[in-house]
Amino acid sequence: MSVEKALKDLVKTGVYAMGFKQSLKAVKAGEAKAIVIAENTPPELRRKLEYYAKLAGIPIIVYRGTRMDMGLVMGRRHGVSVLAVIDEGSSRILEQAEEA
C-alpha cells in the first residue's frame, strides 16, 4: 500500500493530529503512534520532530511530496507539513513505517 492511499484511508477511518504544534503535542503526550512528514518540511521543524520522536520511540514516515501535495491527498486546500497518527483506523499506515 502506498503512503498516499494510507493517508486517504487515515483521513476517513483514523484519528490524527494535523500540523506541527498539534503533532508535537501528541508526541509529548504519548498519544502518537507515528509521525508523517512532508519532504519539504522546514529543516528546523523536522529536526525538532525527529528529536522528540526518537525520544518517544515513534517512527517517522516521510511523504515523498510537498506539503501542498500532502494536503491535497488529505482533502485539504492547504499544505500539511506534519501529522501525528493517533489511531490508524483501517489505513494500515503504520506498515509504511516498518517498510521505511
From Swiss-Prot:
Keywords: Ribonucleoprotein, Ribosomal protein. GO terms for cellular component: cytosolic large ribosomal subunit. GO terms for molecular function: RNA binding; structural constituent of ribosome. It comes from the Archaea. The keyword Nucleotide-binding does not apply. GO terms for biological process: translation. The keyword Ribonucleoprotein applies. InterPro entries: Ribosomal_eL30 (IPR000231), Ribosomal_eL30-like (IPR039109), Ribosomal_eL30-like_sf (IPR029064), Ribosomal_eL30_CS (IPR022991), Ribosomal_eL8/eL30/eS12/Gad45 (IPR004038). Gene3D superfamilies: 3.30.1330.30. PANTHER family: RIBOSOMAL PROTEIN L30. Belongs to the eukaryotic ribosomal protein eL30 family. This is Large ribosomal subunit protein eL30. It comes from Aeropyrum pernix (strain ATCC 700893 / DSM 11879 / JCM 9820 / NBRC 100138 / K1). The gene is rpl30e.
